[in-house]
Design a protein with these regions (language model features):
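Carbohydrate transferase catalytic cores enriched for Leloir-type hexosyltransferases
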Residues: 1-149
Length: 149
């Protein structure tokens, strides 16, 4: 099976549990003879350096210029569509929550729920925080959901 991972968490995190989870998952799937590729055209993540050659496609930046992370995410979404389509995966695993799908919309998709903190304790977050809404949109679009916490 060919499994593609998108750019989202690798654009957002330099180090972190979510990106480490996806790197370890990719390693384990590859060790079990699955074809795995992570597509993150521009990213700042350090965990991807631990992956075997060919599993990761992208360029690492030390950091994004101030106030440009959202621009890099939009750019990555557009630029990764072509390479994901050409690689022709069987499944795309979106690495975080977003309003729009990553990769071709006709592919089956998997989303991982990392926790339910925003839903359990909404009073702890700003009313402007859109995390719960993006999570709901992502889950509605998913064909399969993995819950890890």
């Amino acid at each position: 099976m060919k499994i593609a991972y998108d750019y989202q968490t690798f654009t957002q995190q330099t180090y972190g549990g979510i990106s480490r989870y996806f790197v370890r998952l990719a390693e384990q799937l590859q060790a079990n003879d699955q074809q795995v590729k992570i597509f993150a055209p521009f990213h700042r993540n350090r965990h991807v350096g631990e992956l075997p050659e060919g599993v990761f496609q992208g360029t690492q930046l030390d950091k994004f210029p101030p106030r440009t992370a959202r621009l890099f995410s939009m750019y990555n979404r557009m630029v990764s569509m072509g390479p994901i389509s050409r690689w022709a995966p069987d499944i795309i695993h979106e690495t975080y929550y977003s309003a729009k799908p990553s990769g071709p919309s006709n592919l089956p998709r998997v989303t991982t729920v990392h926790d339910m903190i925003h839903e359990r304790y909404p009073e702890s977050f700003s009313r402007l925080d859109g995390s719960s809404k993006l999570k709901r949109i992502s889950l509605e679009r998913a064909d399969h959901v993995i819950c890890i916490s």
